Amino acid sequence: MSKRTFQPSNLKRKRSHGFRARMATANGRKVLARRRAKGRARLSA
């Protein structure tokens, strides 16, 4: 039997999907803009 592939880590989660990670790149800022336009309660992890 194979192991579960999702091994949660809040540090990795924030580093790859966090607000500051999104703000760091132009495309990340586009992601945030789209989510704001859609009216998301949470913009990032």
Curated annotation (Swiss-Prot):
The GO biological-process annotations, alphabetized, read as: translation
Where composition is biased (Polar residues), the residues are: 1-10
Indicate yes or no for the key word Transport. no
Q: Where is the signal peptide?
A: none
Question: What domain of life is recorded for the organism?
Answer: Bacteria
Annotated segments matching region Disordered: 1-45
Q: Cite the entry's keywords alphabetically.
A: Ribonucleoprotein, Ribosomal protein
Provide any one GO MF term from the record.
structural constituent of ribosome
Show the ranges annotated as biased composition (Basic residues): 11-20, 31-45
Q: Per the record, GO CC terms?
A: ribonucleoprotein complex; ribosome
Query: Which InterPro entries does the record match to this protein?
Result: Ribosomal_bL34, Ribosomal_bL34_CS
NCBIfam families given for it?
A: rpmH_bact
The family annotation for this protein states: Belongs to the bacterial ribosomal protein bL34 family.
Q: What is this protein called?
A: Large ribosomal subunit protein bL34
Question: Which organism is the protein's source?
Answer: Shewanella amazonensis (strain ATCC BAA-1098 / SB2B)
Its encoding gene is what? Answer: rpmH
